[in-house]
From Swiss-Prot:
Its EC number is 5.2.1.8. Keywords: Isomerase, Nucleus, Rotamase. It comes from Arabidopsis thaliana (Mouse-ear cress). PROSITE patterns: CSA_PPIASE_2. This is Peptidyl-prolyl cis-trans isomerase CYP95. The gene is CYP95. It is found in: Nucleus. Expressed in leaves, flowers, roots and stems.
Length: 837
């Protein structure tokens, strides 16, 4: 029907070098015939060389140069391959076509109208409905197969449209039954070639294993054992070859005979399996670990063999051979033999970099081939899943006794299947290499820990696996604390949160990290998180800030720059911080309050955050959100900006000017605040004025810029009846009067008046000042500083009274301003202040 009529094209797309996956598009020639034909011809490459560019008019080999997460992907520059050029099949004169379809679905193909003469080969694929493209782009097709690959493409983009990895069009063309047939032919050829490849690979693997066995430290034993091992793979290869011949012959015979031969084959397999384990057990009766690893390896070898046969076709195609299984068998045996000695000799540093690299490369492609052989730490890191196992195994090897306990822990958690086995290995290794305990010191740092963390990151697959092995193995040697910090991987990864975990992990920063280093600092707060961990957390938040970076620099310190520097003190930077408590807040994350977060994010701003974070203030924590903006500002500035820090507030009480009266008044009008709360405002009267001005572009203005008179004039129509009240503060009657009134008055009119008057009052710093002295007891200054209801209103609104309160106490308190404490109301004010600055 329509779909059959419409031409279809395919694109095999590879993301970051992974195996190509196919996307099939249906074109709409009836809607946009010129554009559809252009796209189809560029997919097939049938138009030859472009007259303008001199390049083949073919999408093959070009990249997705722009990937806007949540919007669309753009590709089609086969000239420069970076989005700066393109060419259509119409030689620079692309016929105009008006848009008829809307961008209402995911996976729609469209082309820009404006740039079609210059970039006539560029096309868009939508990730979501996108109305912004409706007027500027012509829809000429849609994705009918390969939505998963489209999602993957979207994941590697960012908000700016820059792909984080390369996304390449490996092949493209017209999609039809012919393509499927050709694929089938290719597969058939592949099958035939597999046999030849297998033979060659077996030879290579046997030679490699021999050479490796020669280099073994236990020369006599290892050589003899390796020879026996090699015999089994060679025997397997020959027997498998014979089987294939038999199959050929049997194919000509009757079914009965075939079934008999099949049975014989199965029996041979069984006998071989039985023999192999015996050999292994014979080989390493000396050490428990060897025997265990041997038996496990043998089982895994059998599994590998079976799996390889079952997946013969697929494996050969992806990895190019099933021999890796045999090769791995030999390696595993060798590793099993030398595992104990290596651990003792190299202190577990030996991570077999080559194997690791190979495994990293292969991991993406053949996770199914590899079985977990805990004993072969490196070999099993192949699959991403195993990355963890790899690092785990490394960790055990690295720090046998010390790390094993923790390592098993994460191992188990990470991959239960592997877990049990690995745990065994770990325990064995523990027994086996007490000598390697030289690393005892590392134990404290417990690489394992880092491993446990890094596994989490293992998602990074490559990086992580590397990081654990590299970072961990290295780090133990280096210095419990610092080594991890170094974690090159981290450095590399530094940017991504996951990375920072890695970092942390290697550091031991994992939740446990604190154990070893946090002990001194993080204990106070959350040892597990520990300063470092907090960092790690913080880094995650600021991946960019890269705690990692800082951590890298300062093993312990770098964590949160500020926090690390002074767990408690870091706060010092900003009032909140200084309060120590504030820091604490931040520390929530970090050992102490490190503020780590806030410092990292913005020494100054963070503060505000930190206040939020203040242990006490944790309530304020919600502010954290705002923190950056209003509250955060205020706190940060708090000290330095006065904005709200009690101390600065004091100093700059003037600024808060209105707040003190406000506070007083608002207090006196407590009814109003209560009324407000009842009304669902969530703020005390204090903030009423703020609320009112909140709509104005800058809250700062009303309090500072307008005098009480101007304010009065401004709102005269509404306030006509309340001027006396405005004056009352000057007379000094205000306090009693207001108090009375607040009690008696309903939140209604008074409330409103009050609100207005309030703002004037506020702006009327003079009265405010006068009263200030009396108010001082009220902690006017703090209140004032905070009183900047404005800012408060700003952040408070979001935060709610609780927040402001919590803040003020923590802030005020931490600053140790009696007034700030005294003015619980002021908290709100304070918040306001913050917003101001």
């Amino acid at each position: 029907m329509a779909k059959k009529k419409n031409p279809q094209v395919f694109m095999d797309v590879s993301i970051d070098g992974d195996p190509a996956e196919t996307m099939v598009f249906e074109l709409f020639p009836e809607v946009a015939p010129k554009t559809s034909e252009n796209f189809r011809a560029l997919c097939t490459g049938e138009k030859g060389i472009g007259p303008r560019s001199g390049k083949p008019l073919h999408y093959k080999g070009s990249f997705f140069h722009r990937i806007m997460k949540g919007s669309s992907a753009q590709a089609g520059d086969f000239v420069n391959r970076n989005g700066t050029a393109g060419e259509s099949i119409y030689a620079g004169k692309f016929p105009d076509e008006s848009p008829k379809l809307r961008h209402e679905e995911t996976g729609l193909l469209s082309m820009s109208i404006a740039d079609r003469d210059k970039f006539g080969s560029h096309f868009h694929i939508t990730f979501r409905p996108n109305q912004q493209l409706d007027r500027n782009n012509v829809v000429f097709g849609k994705l009918i197969q390969g939505k998963e690959i489209l999602k993957k493409i979207e994941r590697v983009g960012d908000e700016e449209g820059k792909p984080t990895v390369s996304v390449k069009i490996i092949r493209c063309g017209e999609y039809s039954g012919d393509k499927k047939k050709s694929d089938g032919k290719k597969n058939g050829k592949h099958k035939k070639s597999l046999r030849v490849r297998r033979k060659k690979r077996r030879r290579h693997s046997s030679s490699e294993s021999e050479s490796s066995s020669d280099s073994e430290t236990d020369s006599s034993e290892s050589d003899s054992e390796s020879d026996s091992d090699l015999s089994s793979p060679s025997f397997l290869s020959s027997s498998s070859h014979e089987r294939q011949k038999k199959r050929k012959r049997s194919s000509k015979k009757d079914k009965h005979r075939r079934s008999k031969q099949r049975d014989k084959r199965h029996e041979k397999k069984r006998s071989m399996r039985d023999k192999r384990p015996k050999r292994k057990s014979r080989r390493s009766p000396d050490s428990l670990e060897d025997s265990n690893s041997g038996s496990e390896a043998s089982l895994s070898d059998v599994n590998v063999e079976i799996g390889a046969k079952k997946r013969k076709h697929r494996v050969s195609r992806r990895t190019g051979n099933s021999a890796p299984a045999v090769e791995k068998e030999a390696e595993s045996l060798h590793q099993g033999k030398r595992k104990g000695p290596d651990l003792l000799e190299n202190r577990g540093l030996r991570s077999n970099g080559i194997s690791d690299a190979a495994s990293e490369q292969i991991s993406d492609r053949q996770p199914d081939i590899v079985d977990d052989h805990p004993s072969k730490s490196r070999s099993r890191s192949l699959s991403p899943k195993r990355t963890v196992s790899k690092s785990t195994s490394v960790s055990p090897r690295r720090s046998q006794s010390k790390s094993p306990s923790s390592s098993p822990r994460w191992n188990g958690g990470r991959s239960p299947a592997k877990g049990s086995r690995q745990v065994k290995n770990l325990t064995n290794s523990r027994r086996e290499s007490p000598g390697s305990e030289e690393k005892g010191r590392h134990v404290r740092r417990s690489p394992t820990k880092s491993v446990s963390r890094s596994p989490v990151r293992v998602k990074k697959e490559r990086d992580i696996s590397r990081s654990p092995s590299k970072s961990l193995s290295r780090s133990p040697l280096r210095s419990p604390k610092r080594v991890i910090s170094r974690s090159p991987v981290r450095g590399r990864i530094a940017r991504s949160p996951s990375r920072s975990p890695v970092r942390s992990a290697s550091r031991g920063s994992l939740g446990r990290g604190p154990l070893r280093r946090s002990s001194r600092r993080s204990p106070s707060r959350s040892p597990v998180r520990s300063s470092r961990r907090s960092l790690s957390r913080s880094p995650i938040q600021l991946s960019r800030r890269s705690l990692s970076r800082s951590p890298t620099r300062l093993s312990r310190r770098s964590l949160s720059r500020s926090p690390i520097r002074s767990p408690r003190k870091s706060v010092s930077r900003s009032p909140v911080r200084s309060s120590r408590k504030s820091v604490s807040r931040s520390p929530v994350r970090s050992s102490r309050r490190r503020i780590s977060r806030s410092p990292v994010r913005s020494s100054r701003k963070s503060v505000s955050r930190s206040p939020i974070r203040l242990s006490r203030r944790s309530i304020s924590r919600s502010p954290i959100r705002l923190s950056r903006r209003s509250i955060s500002r205020s706190p940060v500035r708090g000290r330095r900006r006065i904005s709200r820090s009690p101390v600065p507030a004091r100093r700059r009480s003037v600024r808060p000017r209105s707040p003190p009266p406000d506070r007083r008044r608002s207090l006196s009008r407590s009814a109003s605040p209560n009324g407000r709360i009842r009304r669902g405002r969530g703020f005390s009267q204090r903030f009423s004025y703020a609320r009112r001005y909140r709509t104005s572009p800058s809250p700062d203005r009303s309090p500072y810029r307008f005098s009480d008179r101007s304010d009065r004039d401004r709102f005269r129509s509404r306030r006509r009846f309340s001027p006396s009240r405005f004056r009352s503060p000057l007379r000094g009657r205000t306090p009693p009067r207001y108090r009375r009134r607040s009690r008696s008055v309903s939140p209604g009119l008074c409330y409103r008046n009050r609100r207005y008057s309030r703002s004037p009052i506020r702006s009327r710093s003079p009265p405010y000042r006068k009263r200030r002295s009396p108010s001082a007891s009220h902690s006017l200054s703090p209140s004032r500083s905070r009183s900047r209801s404005k800012s408060y209103s700003k952040s408070p609104i979001g935060t709610g009274k609780a927040r402001s309160v919590s803040r003020s106490p923590s802030k005020a308190r931490s600053p140790s301003k009696s007034d700030s404490t005294s003015s619980d109301n002021s908290p709100g004010g304070k918040k306001g202040l913050v917003a101001y600055d």
